[in-house]
Each structure stands twice: as C-alpha cells, then as structure tokens.
From Swiss-Prot:
Transmembrane intervals: 1-21
Main localization (coarse): membrane
Keywords for this protein: Cell inner membrane, Cell membrane, Membrane, Protein transport, Translocation, Transmembrane, Transmembrane helix, Transport
Pfam families linked to this entry: TatA_B_E (PF02416)
Protein name: Sec-independent protein translocase protein TatA
GO terms for biological process, alphabetical: protein transport by the Tat complex
Molecular function (Gene Ontology), one example: protein transmembrane transporter activity
Record-stated family: Belongs to the TatA/E family.
Gene3D superfamilies on file: 1.20.5.3310
Length: 54
C-alpha cells in the first residue's frame, strides 16, 4: 500500500504548480535542511537516552 510511480508523479506535478519553477530549488533545499536537522535531533535524542540508562 505504498505510493506507486503515478502517485509520486502527481504529487510532484502539484508541487511544481504550487511553487513554480523558480522557487522549487529553494523549497527542496529547505526541505533537505529540515530533514537533516530532524535526523540529527533524533540521533542526539537516542544518545541522550543511552546515557540516562547507564
């Protein structure tokens, strides 16, 4: 029950229409930075829990 290629294509088309070609690289860059910050935060949270358990 995952996303098929056609679903992904429709989502990308909607994003392209909403943001336009000019802003799309900036939006993707901001999204990547947000995901990286989230992953780093989750990794830091995991190491904090390990220290508390010892």
């Amino acid at each position: 029950m995952g996303m098929s290629f056609s679903h992904l294509l429709i989502v990308l088309l909607i994003i392209f229409v909403l943001f336009g070609a000019g802003k799309l690289p900036q939006v993707m860059s901001d999204l990547a930075k947000g995901l990286k910050a989230f992953k780093d935060g989750m990794k830091d949270e995991g190491s904090d829990n390990d220290k508390k358990n010892n």
